[in-house]
C-alpha cells in the first residue's frame, strides 16, 4: 500500500479518536460461529475509530483466525483441547436439538437442553480455567492496561477475566426474553402474562393455556438456571477470585448489555437503562455477487430468485428431508440458491443450484431476490428486514429460531412450517403463499422502515456505549439497584409479608376487641337479670 494511503488511514483513525473521545484499549472474550461474526463487526468498527482491540482466544478455536486479523490483535492462550473437540461441542448440540429434542412443550425438552448445555459447559469451563490459570498471560494482560472487556454472555469467562483485571465489562447477547441470563444477571423484568419465554414459540398475544404453559416453563427455567452454574461454575469463580461468590453475582456487574435484537423483531416489553438493543448491526450494503451466481440470478428473468439457507450449524440433513425440499423447490418458477452441504438430492430440479456457501447478505440485497427460506437465525432475519425485499418462509430448527420465526409470523412477514412433519406440498404451498400474497412483502417493508428509522444505526449505538464505558470507567448509574437486594426484596415478598402480618394483626386485634365487648355486654346483661 502506498505510503500516502497509510498516512491517510492513520489520520482517519486519529480523527475518529478526537470525535469519540480518547482512543482506548479493548479486551475481547468471544464465542464461536455467528456469535463471533456479530462481535467482529463491532470490533472492526472500533479499530476504524482508532481503538486498540485485543482478542483473547484459546489455541483451540474454530472461528477465530489470527491470519484474518484486519487490524485486530490476537492473544492466544495454549489449551489442552484441540479444534475438533471445540467443533464437536457445538455441532452435536445443533444436530441433537434439531432431530432429537422433543418439541411443543418446554417441560419435555428442557431436560434434553440440560444435557446438551452440560456438555458445552464442561469444555468451556476447561478452556476458561486454562486461560485464567495462566499467570504469565494474566500478568501480560494487566500490564496492557485495558479500558474495558467486551464479552459474549453465553460463553462464561469474560466477566471473570474482567474481575481479575478489575475492569468494567460490556456484554453482547442475542436473547431478549429474560428467563435466565437477563432476568437474574441483568435484572431484566419479565412479566410472563404477556412476554413469552425463550424457546416457547409463543406470540405476544397468548391464550390462557399458553400463559399457563408460559408460567410453568418460566418456573422450570428459573430452577434450571439457578442450579446449572452452582455445581461447577460457582466453586470455580470462588476458587479463582479467592472469595465466596457466584457466576451470576459476577455477571451482575456488567455495565451495559448489547442485545442483538430490536423492536422490529421483539414484542413490546419492559427494559432497563443499561440494556441497549442493537439488532441488525451486522447488516452491510450488498456487494456484487460472484460471476457464476450473478449469471444464475440474471437467468431467472422476471420470476426472480429464492434464497434457501438453514444456517451453518446444521451441516447435513437426512436424504429424505433433502428430497422433500428439493421436490418442492423444483415446482416453482423462480431460480433457487440453496445452501446445502449434503449429498445431491435425487429430486433436485434444474431451477435449483446447490452451494456449500452463499453470500447471504449480498443475495438478500440483490434486486432479483423475491423471497427467503430461513431456519430463523437472527442474522438472516435481520438481513431480510434490513433490505425490506424478501418475505420469509421459516423452518425453525433449534435455539431461539422458533421464537424468531413466531415473531415474524405474528407481525405478518412470514409463514412457518415444521421441519420434521412438512411434506413437499406443505413447503410448496408456503412458498406460493409468500410470493402470491402481497401482504407479506408489505409487512417486511414496514418492518424495514421501522428498522431504519432510528436516531443511531445499531452499529453506531453499540460502539457508542462501549466508548461511553471507556470514557466514564463504567456505567454504574445505569445498573438496576435490584442487584443490591435479595430475591425476596426484589419481588417485594418481604413487604407483602409485612403488610399481611399487619393486616392479620389488625384482624386479630379486632376479633379480640369484639370478643371482649361481647363478653362484657353478656356479663352486664347477666348481672341485670340476676
From Swiss-Prot:
Gene Ontology BP annotations: androgen metabolic process; estrogen metabolic process; xenobiotic metabolic process
Cellular compartments annotated: Endoplasmic reticulum membrane
List of glycosylated residues: 316
InterPro entries referenced in this protein's UniProt entry, alphabetically: UDP-glycosyltransferase, UDP_glucos_trans, UDP_glycos_trans_CS
Enzyme Commission number: 2.4.1.17
Principal localisation: endoplasmic reticulum
GO MF term set: glucuronosyltransferase activity
Signal peptide range: 1-17
Catalytic activity: glucuronate acceptor + UDP-alpha-D-glucuronate = acceptor beta-D-glucuronoside + UDP + H(+); 17alpha-estradiol + UDP-alpha-D-glucuronate = 17alpha-estradiol 17-O-(beta-D-glucuronate) + UDP + H(+); 17beta-estradiol + UDP-alpha-D-glucuronate = 17beta-estradiol 17-O-(beta-D-glucuronate) + UDP + H(+); 2-hydroxy-17beta-estradiol + UDP-alpha-D-glucuronate = 2-hydroxy-17beta-estradiol 3-O-(beta-D-glucuronate) + UDP + H(+)
Entry's Gene Ontology cellular component terms: endoplasmic reticulum membrane
Keywords: Endoplasmic reticulum, Glycoprotein, Glycosyltransferase, Lipid metabolism, Membrane, Signal, Steroid metabolism, Transferase, Transmembrane, Transmembrane helix
Primary role: UDP-glucuronosyltransferase (UGT) that catalyzes phase II biotransformation reactions in which lipophilic substrates are conjugated with glucuronic acid to increase the metabolite's water solubility, thereby facilitating excretion into either the urine or bile. Essential for the elimination and detoxification of drugs, xenobiotics and endogenous compounds. Catalyzes the glucuronidation of endogenous steroid hormones such as androgens (epitestosterone, androsterone) and estrogens (estradiol, epiestradiol, estriol, catechol estrogens).
Entry's family note: Belongs to the UDP-glycosyltransferase family.
Protein name: UDP-glucuronosyltransferase 2B7
Amino acid at each position: 500500500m502506498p505510503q500516502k494511503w497509510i498516512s491517510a488511514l492513520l489520520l482517519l483513525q486519529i480523527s475518529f479518536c478526537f470525535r469519540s473521545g480518547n482512543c482506548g484499549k479493548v479486551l475481547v472474550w468471544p464465542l464461536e460461529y455467528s456469535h463471533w461474526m456479530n462481535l467482529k463487526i463491532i470490533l472492526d468498527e472500533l479499530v476504524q475509530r482508532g481503538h486498540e482491540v485485543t482478542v483473547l482466544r484459546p489455541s483451540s478455536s474454530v472461528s477465530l483466525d489470527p491470519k484474518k486479523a484486519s487490524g485486530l490483535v490476537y492473544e492466544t492462550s495454549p489449551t489442552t483441547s484441540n479444534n475438533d473437540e471445540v467443533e464437536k461441542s457445538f455441532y452435536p448440540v445443533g444436530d441433537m436439538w434439531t432431530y432429537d429434542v422433543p418439541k411443543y412443550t418446554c417441560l419435555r425438552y428442557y431436560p434434553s437442553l440440560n444435557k446438551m448445555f452440560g456438555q458445552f459447559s464442561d469444555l468451556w469451563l476447561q478452556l476458561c480455567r486454562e486461560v485464567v490459570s495462566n499467570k504469565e498471560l494474566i500478568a501480560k494482560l494487566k500490564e496492557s492496561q485495558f479500558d474495558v472487556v467486551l464479552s459474549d454472555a453465553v460463553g462464561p469467562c469474560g466477566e471473570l477475566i474482567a474481575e481479575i483485571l478489575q475492569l468494567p465489562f460490556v456484554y453482547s447477547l442475542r436473547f431478549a426474553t429474560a428467563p435466565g441470563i437477563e432476568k437474574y444477571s441483568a435484572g431484566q423484568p419479565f412479566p410472563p402474562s404477556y412476554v413469552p419465554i425463550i424457546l416457547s414459540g409463543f406470540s405476544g398475544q397468548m391464550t390462557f393455556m399458553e400463559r399457563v404453559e408460559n408460567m410453568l416453563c418460566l418456573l422450570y427455567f428459573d430452577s434450571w438456571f439457578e442450579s446449572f452454574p452452582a455445581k461447577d461454575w460457582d466453586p470455580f469463580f470462588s476458587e479463582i477470585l479467592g472469595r465466596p461468590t457466584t457466576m451470576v453475582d459476577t455477571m451482575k456487574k456488567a455495565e451495559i448489555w448489547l442485545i442483538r435484537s430490536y423492536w422490529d423483531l421483539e414484542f413490546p416489553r419492559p427494559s432497563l437503562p443499561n440494556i441497549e438493543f442493537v439488532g441488525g448491526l451486522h447488516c452491510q450494503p450488498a456487494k456484487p455477487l460472484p460471476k457464476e451466481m450473478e449469471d444464475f440470478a440474471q437467468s431467472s428473468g422476471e420470476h426472480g430468485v429464492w434464497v434457501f439457507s438453514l444456517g451453518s450449524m446444521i451441516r447435513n440433513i437426512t436424504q429424505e428431508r433433502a428430497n422433500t425440499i428439493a421436490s418442492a423447490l423444483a415446482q416453482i418458477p423462480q431460480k433457487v440458491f440453496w445452501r446445502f452441504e449434503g449429498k445431491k438430492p435425487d429430486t433436485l430440479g434444474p431451477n435449483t443450484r446447490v452451494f456449500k456457501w452463499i453470500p447471504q447478505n449480498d443475495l438478500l440485497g440483490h434486486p432479483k431476490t423475491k423471497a427467503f427460506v430461513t431456519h430463523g437465525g437472527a442474522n438472516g432475519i435481520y438481513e431480510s428486514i434490513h433490505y425490506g425485499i424478501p418475505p420469509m418462509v421459516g423452518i425453525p430448527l433449534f435455539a431461539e429460531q422458533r421464537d424468531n420465526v413466531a415473531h415474524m409470523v405474528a407481525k405478518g412477514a412470514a409463514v412457518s412450517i415444521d421441519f420434521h412433519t412438512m411434506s413437499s406440498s406443505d413447503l410448496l404451498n408456503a412458498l406460493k403463499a409468500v410470493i402470491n400474497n402481497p401482504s407479506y412483502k408489505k409487512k417486511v417493508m414496514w418492518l424495514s422502515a421501522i428498522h431504519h428509522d432510528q436516531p443511531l444505526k445499531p452499529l453506531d449505538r453499540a460502539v457508542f456505549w462501549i466508548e461511553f464505558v471507556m470514557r466514564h470507567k463504567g456505567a454504574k448509574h445505569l445498573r438496576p439497584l435490584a442487584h443490591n437486594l435479595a430475591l425476596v426484596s426484589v419481588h417485594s415478598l418481604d413487604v407483602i409479608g409485612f403488610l399481611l402480618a399487619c393486616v392479620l394483626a389488625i384482624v386479630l386485634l379486632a376479633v379480640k376487641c369484639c370478643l371482649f365487648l361481647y363478653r362484657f355486654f353478656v356479663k352486664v346483661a347477666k348481672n341485670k337479670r340476676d
